[in-house]
Each structure stands twice: as C-alpha cells, then as structure tokens.
C-alpha cells in the first residue's frame, strides 16, 4: 500500500504526537539536512536575509520540506554559485501521523475489523506551522535580492496553503537591525561569532569591558 496523500494530513486536528517510548516504530523523516550552502560564512559576509512565512495554521510533511529545500538550493546554486548563500530550513518534523490500514483484496471483510480498534500505526512525520511562523530563510549578499525572492517563490509551490515572502530588516540571521548593526560592531557592543553575534551589554564586570576596548 502506497503513502496516503498529504492533503489527508493538512490540518492540525489533534494534539502534538511526537516520537516517544509510547509511540515507537516511527519512520525516519525525509528531510535530514537543514542547513545548506556556505554555512560557515562569517556574519558580516551575508547581510541580506529573506524569509518564507506561513499564512496558515497547518501541517507540512517532511517530504514537502525536503522538496522545497532541494528546489531552493538548486536555483540558488545556479544563480549565485554554491558559496554565495546560506539556506536554513526553520521547521523540524516532530509530529507523528498515523494510518489505519484497510485491506482491499477479495474476502477482506472476513479478515479485518473495520473501525474497531482504529488507532493507526505511525506512517510518517510532519511539522506543525503557525500563522506568521518562518518556514525557510536564506542569507546572502545584497546584490542577490532578486534571486532570493525567486528561490523562495519556487519553493512555495511545494507546500499547501498560502505563504508570503518577506525580506528582513535584520542583518543576516541575527536579531539586530541592518542599519544599526555596523555601528554596534564598531562600538564593540556586538562581537561576530560564526553566523551569529554575541551581544555585550552595558552592565557587567568593568575588567571585561576594559579588555574588549583595550
């Protein structure tokens, strides 16, 4: 018996049902890689960030997340080069979906119990997404803005429902505004740390502040 279509599991009807010691035998999620491109690029190399934002409360299958990841990656590699971007899938499929298998062969009515004991077996995993939640983010150089929008537009077709593309006012994957970021780095209030930054507050030990500004 093949996989049931994802439209059967589109809506969030039940409570979250994750893999646990009570819910065993769950198949592995199709999506295994959540970061692609130049993951180790320093925070100051990729200032532009684009998000795909969900406009519905629904469930997205791990197969759909994998298809969208491949689609966005293929377009970005072709248009910006394999080292010109960093894609991050922001959803993880933890919710387990079930199927109550029905026999369709001749004489099935004598073998199966119908809706008696209908709690199904695990079939796959989905990610539950809320309105306004980010599904996928891409950071890159400022001149690649149109390519980011097009890559996310193509990836949107892999998902049900409605999504919006949003170009962030923040710097890369950080939470600091792009127009203030460089000034904060110059004042040593932010210290680059891989693809993120460390925020140095105004309060704290004076020795640390002196060591930074010496």
Curated annotation (Swiss-Prot):
GO BP annotations listed: embryonic brain development; regulation of translation; translation
Xref: SUPFAM superfamilies: Ribosomal protein L16p/L10e (SSF54686)
Function: Component of the large ribosomal subunit. Plays a role in the formation of actively translating ribosomes. May play a role in the embryonic brain development.
Any one GO molecular-function label of the UniProt entry: structural constituent of ribosome
UniProt record similarity statement: Belongs to the universal ribosomal protein uL16 family.
Subunit field text: Component of the large ribosomal subunit. Mature ribosomes consist of a small (40S) and a large (60S) subunit. The 40S subunit contains about 33 different proteins and 1 molecule of RNA (18S). The 60S subunit contains about 49 different proteins and 3 molecules of RNA (28S, 5.8S and 5S).
GO cellular component, one term: large ribosomal subunit
Classification via PANTHER family: 60S RIBOSOMAL PROTEIN L10
Crosslink (Glycyl lysine isopeptide (Lys-Gly) (interchain with G-Cter in ubiquitin)) position: 188
Subcellular location: Cytoplasm
InterPro entries according to UniProt: Ribosomal_uL16 (IPR047873), Ribosomal_uL16_CS_euk_arc (IPR018255), Ribosomal_uL16_dom (IPR016180), Ribosomal_uL16_euk_arch (IPR001197), Ribosomal_uL16_sf (IPR036920)
Post-translational modification: Citrullinated by PADI4.
Name recorded for this polypeptide: Large ribosomal subunit protein uL16
Organism for this UniProt entry: Sus scrofa
Domain of life: Eukaryota
Pfam families: Ribosomal_L16 (PF00252)
Location in chain, cross-link Glycyl lysine isopeptide (Lys-Gly) (interchain with G-Cter in SUMO2): 175
Keywords from the UniProt entry: Citrullination, Cytoplasm, Developmental protein, Isopeptide bond, Ribonucleoprotein, Ribosomal protein, Ubl conjugation
Classification via NCBIfam families: PRK04199.1-4, uL16_euk_arch
